[in-house]
A protein has these predicted regions:
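An N-terminal assembly and electron-transfer interface module characteristic of large anaerobic redox
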Residues: 1-526
Length: 526
């Protein structure tokens, strides 16, 4: 009797563009691959790892799109494929080949703070959704020792898909909005459609995040047309800012109580020259915002500026804050947007920029603090019976979210990703009710997910442990979203990013979206 051949499953190791990151992350990827291989063999499948380990590069990741296309050209186009994610990875390395792949596709990630495969999974999934590529999601902390993981993996191996209960998502049209909120939303939507809100996006497609790029026709239809700008122009504008102006901005921050983690070695520490360049970038961004009549601006930084200037993150935190150094318009000699935040969407992610502008307009109309920011959905775990998310932006949040500049800490960005350094704008987000949002494009249609939650004040030991397990230099928000815990969010969230602002404006936000013609879902309890 002939032995039955085991079905092959290809395990794809997608990674970062930077080999330095690949070297650091490879041991964890290797550990994850072994766990997934073991799990598949338990189910009588034959896992094949692609690409092979490269001894010269000291890792086995795909690091560019062409490497992804080459890898997929060598496998059966109908084969089962698992993209194994144990760290941050650029989704466009594999999204092109996956668009034409005919076999089942699974995005599989660890659920870990230090090694954020879950962040990459959410980004990859949102990218594939935008490109109309059918796929499934799966995540775990322990893989083969996790019964739910094994059950779902077996289901995917047999059927080619995994389905999740998404009863935590409700169409906003089913909400019983107050008449006051409905009228508010109608009025604001009419104002936006009449006046427009121009979205300034510098060099779209940061780090391969195609989910951060939205069809211009869809944006224009909701009154938020795109202004495509170049980061090279930002650098050129920086050269026009003199040292005196830059130093004045830095002096302002120090006077307000911002703490700088100064050092002497520019390759390891935060030094004065790095921050002066950041202050020039701040003035340049404000003037570009004014010149083009923008309602928001998004600086991707990675990878386009990483070899040119220090990090943009301190700049981003300053822009998104009402209390910030004044910048003068060289033509009118007037202060630009005095006493107001200039909405900045991190990493040029228009999926955050759109709700940030809507939230800003709502907050200002209601006389509430208008600061907003996006965060990575970085990790989470239970604390005293509640699942508390670690939301962590990769460098700069508005100090208003920490309770003011006196609570802001500026660290050097980690050298692995930021060789030219530059400061973060970090702190621990203050306790309070928040509204969260996410705008996206899926299968050719736009959508908005939103809800409410609460930033919690955790004991210092717990906060420090969460920072230690993620990235200690970055801003953190410890957030509980009732009804949107680990498995609910991981099953349905439409990005690796989530946008937050303080105060409950959910009804006004939903009403505005519906009147703009944006299909909207409300997640969790509300």
């Amino acid at each position: 009797m002939m032995k039955k051949d085991k079905k092959k499953v290809y395990l794809i190791s997608n990674g970062d563009f930077r080999d330095s990151a690949g070297v650091v992350c490879w041991p964890k990827q290797e550990e994850t691959l072994k766990a997934v291989q073991k799990a598949l063999r338990k189910l009588d499948f034959d896992p094949q790892v692609i690409p092979s380990y490269d001894p010269k590069r000291k890792h086995g990741f795909l690091t560019k799109q062409y490497e992804g296309t080459q890898a997929f050209s060598k496998i059966d186009p109908t084969a089962s494929v698992v993209v194994v994610l144990s760290c941050w990875a650029y989704s466009h390395h594999v999204s092109g080949p996956l668009q034409t792949h005919q076999g089942p596709i699974l995005l599989l990630a660890n659920f870990d703070g230090t090694w954020p495969g879950l962040v990459a999974l959410l980004n990859h999934s949102a990218t594939l959704d935008r490109l109309c590529v059918k796929h499934s999601r799966l995540w775990s902390e322990t893989f083969g020792d996790d019964p739910d993981f094994m059950k779902r993996l077996e289901t995917w191996c047999k059927t080619g898909e995994i389905k999740y209960d998404k009863c935590h998502l409700v169409s906003a049209e089913e909400m019983n909005l107050s008449s006051k909120a409905a009228q508010f939303g109608e009025k604001l939507a009419k104002k936006i459609l009449h006046e427009k809100r121009i979205m300034g996006q510098l060099d779209p497609g940061c780090m391969g995040m195609l989910n951060a790029v939205i069809n211009p026709a869809k944006l224009g239809a909701i009154g938020m047309p795109i202004e495509l700008l170049n980061q090279s122009d930002l650098v050129a504008e920086m050269s026009l800012v003199d040292d005196y102006e830059a130093q004045s901005h830095l002096n302002w921050l120090i006077k307000k109580g911002a703490w700088f983690d100064w050092g002497t070695d520019q390759f390891e520490h935060l030094v004065h020259s790095q921050v002066i360049m950041q202050m020039k970038m701040y003035s340049a961004a404000v003037r570009i915002y004014q010149r083009y009549g923008l309602s928001a601006i998004g600086i991707p930084y990675q990878v386009g500026l990483v070899r040119s200037v220090p990090a943009s993150d301190l700049v981003e935190g300053m822009l998104n804050n009402s209390e910030r150094p004044e910048v003068i318009d060289p033509e009118t000699k007037k202060v630009i947007c005095k006493g107001k935040p200039i909405v900045h969407f991190n990493e040029g992610d228009i999926g955050s920029g759109v709700p940030q502008v809507l939230m800003r307009d709502i907050y200002e109309a209601k006389g509430m603090p208008p600061e907003t920011t996006l965060h990575d959905v970085r990790w989470g775990r239970e604390y005293e019976g509640k699942f508390i998310w670690v939301f962590e932006i990769s460098g700069g949040a508005p100090p208003a979210h920490f309770g003011g500049w006196k609570n802001a800490k500026i660290y050097r960005q980690p050298k692995m990703y930021f060789p030219l350094g530059g400061g973060t704008c970090s702190g621990v987000s203050k306790p309070g009710v928040i509204t969260w949002t996410r705008f996206y494009e899926q299968s050719g249609e736009i959508g908005m997910d939103c809800g409410t939650g609460e930033v919690l004040a955790l004991p210092d030991a717990e906060v420090n442990d969460r920072l230690k397990k993620t990235t200690s230099e970055w801003p953190i928000a410890n957030v509980h979203i009732p009804g949107y815990d680990r498995d609910q969010l991981m099953a349905s969230h439409m990005s690796n990013h989530i946008t937050i602002g303080y105060g409950n404006i959910l009804e006004e936000f939903v009403a505005t979206c519906l009147h703009l013609g944006i299909p909207t879902r409300v997640a969790g309890e509300h």
